[in-house]
Amino acid sequence: MSLSVEAKAKIVSEFGRGENDSGSTEVQVALLTAQINHLQGHFAEHKKDHHSRRGLLRMVSQRRKLLDYLKRKDVARYSALIERLGLRR
């Protein structure tokens, strides 16, 4: 199950540079993080759902690529985003 429209709008307004900024790297990473966190709860209950696990791994990979891009382009924004999202790096 994906995020609700309200949850996505909240993330966009919180991490975006404007109200309708859904394309910035920070917003994309925040949306992927929310979806990943939601799926982790799903896998606690459905351990053998390998089809969805592949989608989860794809999301994690996409988030990693976006974070690497942001780190190359602007280290300050990268560090701030990692801190706000509570990611390990």
UniProtKB/Swiss-Prot annotation:
GO terms for molecular function: rRNA binding; structural constituent of ribosome. One of the primary rRNA binding proteins, it binds directly to 16S rRNA where it helps nucleate assembly of the platform of the 30S subunit by binding and bridging several RNA helices of the 16S rRNA. Forms an intersubunit bridge (bridge B4) with the 23S rRNA of the 50S subunit in the ribosome. Transmembrane segments: none annotated. PROSITE patterns: RIBOSOMAL_S15 (PS00362). Belongs to the universal ribosomal protein uS15 family. GO terms for cellular component: cytosolic small ribosomal subunit. Keywords: Ribonucleoprotein, Ribosomal protein, RNA-binding, rRNA-binding. SUPFAM superfamilies: S15/NS1 RNA-binding domain. Part of the 30S ribosomal subunit. Forms a bridge to the 50S subunit in the 70S ribosome, contacting the 23S rRNA. The keyword DNA damage does not apply. Coiled coil: none annotated. The keyword Nucleotide-binding does not apply. InterPro entries: Ribosomal_uS15, Ribosomal_uS15_bac-type, uS15_NS1_RNA-bd_sf. This is Small ribosomal subunit protein uS15. GO terms for biological process: translation. HAMAP family: Ribosomal_uS15_B (MF_01343_B).
